[in-house]
Amino acid sequence: MLRALGSRLLVASRPAAYRSFQQSLRPVPRFFIHKMSTKTPINSPKLSSAGPYNQAIKANGVIYCSGQIPVANGKVIEGTVGDQTRQCLLNLQEVLTEAGSSLNKIVKVNIFLADMDDFAAVNKVYTEVLPDPKPARSCVAVKTVPLSTQGVKIEIECIALE
């Protein structure tokens, strides 16, 4: 509580509720801090990366997968956007398997399309490959996707549980 005394303020005392709150604050145990800051890179030897990044990072039981493009054996696959969608999902499955997870444990998917007219074809394959219940999802058209000059029309990334 504050009381005015002339031009000065005096602190009479702090309320009991404030004191009990202060006493309830304790330092976080060290093992919690260590567990929260642990992150493990995941890379499948069966897949190649298009840049300086990890294919996934595992942190606190959650797997954050980098975007996958339709590459198999180091080459962009030819075919429809449906074929490319299937390959992206197969690549994600490989990364998740390497991380000790699976497609069943995906909770969020982000899809990046070079052309939103491909939305229906992507949905057809997506529905066939991913098990129910389907994860939360965003699908957006972007100006370009990686390796678009080589025919890439889609990139898919996801977040999954361990």
Curated annotation (Swiss-Prot):
CDD domains: YjgF_YER057c_UK114_family. The keyword Ion transport does not apply. It is found in: Mitochondrion; Cytoplasm. One of its GO terms (molecular function) is deaminase activity. Transmembrane segments: none annotated. It holds the Pfam family Ribonuc_L-PSP. Keywords: Cytoplasm, Mitochondrion, Transit peptide. One of its GO terms (cellular component) is mitochondrion. The keyword Chaperone does not apply. Plays a role in the maintenance of mitochondrial DNA. Belongs to the RutC family. This is Protein mmf1, mitochondrial. The lineage of its organism: Eukaryota, Fungi, Dikarya, Ascomycota, Taphrinomycotina.
